[in-house]
Amino acid sequence: MITNRCSSLLTRSVALTLSVTALPGIACAFDPYGTWMRPSTGTQVNFYDCAGKLCAKIVAVKDERRKSKIGTVIMAGAIKSADNQWKGDLLNADDGKVYTGVVTMQGPNALNLKGCVAFVCQGETWTEG
């Protein structure tokens, strides 16, 4: 009886130890779907699924002079390129130029959006809006 109890306890102990030590190796996947705010302008952008790809459009602006930008699709058809990362064309709604865009989730409440031309990139971390 004691041997069975000890054996059972040992098995549980080993199982618990293995599961706890495996935790640091687990990667958390976050997705960008929802509304995010660009801190530099107060613009809110909704990221949504479009035929299995990532799209984004402007849904609100802080500056009334930018009101005409509401509804502008700034990203269409971005594909998942790595865990927590999507790549696709990114429209700068202010100047009409298209850049290579990279969306990277930095956690459940932080999205980094980066636009690149050749090897020059600029990015900004956005918060949930």
Role assignments for model-derived ranges:
Residues 15-17, 27:
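Cleavable N-terminal signal peptides
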Residues 32-100:
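Central antiparallel beta-sheet cores of small beta-barrel/beta-sandwich binding domains
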Residues 23-29:
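Sec/Tat signal peptide C-region and signal peptidase I cleavage site
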Residues 2-15:
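Bacterial N-terminal signal peptides that target proteins for export
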Residues 100-124:
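Short, exposed beta-strand-loop hairpins at the edges of beta-sheets
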Residues 128-129:
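Short, solvent-exposed mixed-charge patches
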